[in-house]
C-alpha cells in the first residue's frame, strides 16, 4: 500500500519537497528540487563512483557538477530532484520535455512525452530487497501526477543491462537503440551516447 501527496513546484530557491509518498516496506519518499550549490558535494560524490559510470560524469569536478545543475536549474524544460527516504538522500532523478531535448532528434516525440533519468545513491549496509523499485515507483508516480505527461521515456546507456532490467520490471517497454548526438555549447557539454529507448504509457496515454 502507498499513500501520496503532491504540490506545485515551489519558486526557485525555496527547495521544499514537491512530492511525498509513503511506500510500504521502504518508508516515506520525498522529492525536492536540487539546490546546485548546497547539493553539489553530495551529487559529485555519487556521480564519480564507478557504479555510476553510465551517468557520464565520472571525471567531473565538484565545480563542474555545480555548473551543470545550475544550468538545469535555469531551465523550464529540465528539472532535477533529490529523493530522500525518511529524510536521508537516496537518489538523483531528472525529468525533461522530450520535445526540447536532444532526444527529439532520435525518435518521433509525441505530445505529453516526458523523459527521465535515474541514479540510485549508494546504500549503507546490506542492500534492501525492493528498495530501488519502491523509490523509482514513487518517482514515476510523481512524473504522472501533473496530468500533462502521457508517456514516460527513458534512454539508458545501451550497455546498462541493470537499468534496462529495472525499467522492464517497472512496466516499461524497450524500444530501439539510438545515437544521442553530441551537444557542445558554452553552458553545457554532452558527449554522444548510444542509448536504448524505453517507454511507459500513463493513464492518459492509453
Predicted feature descriptions by range:
Residues 59-80:
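Active-site rim helix/loop that mediates acceptor-substrate recognition in acyltransferases
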Residues 37-41, 51-52:
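Primarily extracytoplasmic ectodomains and periplasmic/lumenal surface modules that are beta-strand-rich
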Residues 27, 79, 91:
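Short beta-strand or tight-loop elements
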Residues 1-4, 18, 39-40, 89-206:
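Acyl-donor (CoA/ACP) binding surface of acyl/acetyltransferases
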Residues 1-37:
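Conserved N-terminal entry element of GNAT/NAT acetyltransferase domains
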Residues 45-59:
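Helix-loop element at the rim of GNAT/NAT acetyltransferase active sites that forms part
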Amino acid at each position: 500500500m502507498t499513500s501520496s501527496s503532491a504540490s506545485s513546484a515551489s519558486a526557485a530557491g525555496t527547495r521544499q519537497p514537491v512530492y511525498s509518498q509513503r511506500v510500504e516496506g521502504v518508508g516515506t519518499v520525498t522529492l525536492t528540487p536540487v539546490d546546485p550549490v548546497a547539493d553539489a558535494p553530495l551529487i559529485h560524490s555519487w556521480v564519480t563512483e564507478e557504479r555510476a559510470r553510465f551517468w557520464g560524469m565520472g571525471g567531473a569536478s565538484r565545480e563542474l557538477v555545480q555548473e551543470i545543475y545550475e544550468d538545469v536549474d535555469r531551465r523550464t524544460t529540465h528539472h532535477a530532484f533529490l529523493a530522500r527516504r525518511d529524510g536521508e538522500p537516496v537518489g538523483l532523478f531528472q525529468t525533461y520535455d522530450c520535445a526540447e531535448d536532444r532526444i527529439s532528434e532520435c525518435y518521433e516525440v509525441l505530445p505529453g512525452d516526458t523523459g527521465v533519468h535515474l541514479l540510485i545513491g549508494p546504500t549503507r549496509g546490506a542492500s534492501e530487497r525492493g528498495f530501488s523499485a519502491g523509490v523509482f515507483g514513487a518517482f514515476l508516480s510523481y512524473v504522472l501526477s501533473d496530468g500533462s505527461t502521457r508517456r514516460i521515456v527513458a534512454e539508458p546507456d545501451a550497455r546498462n543491462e541493470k537499468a534496462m532490467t529495472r525499467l522492464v520490471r517497472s512496466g516499461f517497454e524497450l524500444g530501439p537503440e539510438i545515437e544521442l548526438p553530441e551537444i557542445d555549447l558554452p553552458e553545457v557539454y554532452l558527449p554522444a551516447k548510444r542509448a536504448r529507448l524505453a517507454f511507459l504509457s500513463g493513464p492518459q496515454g492509453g
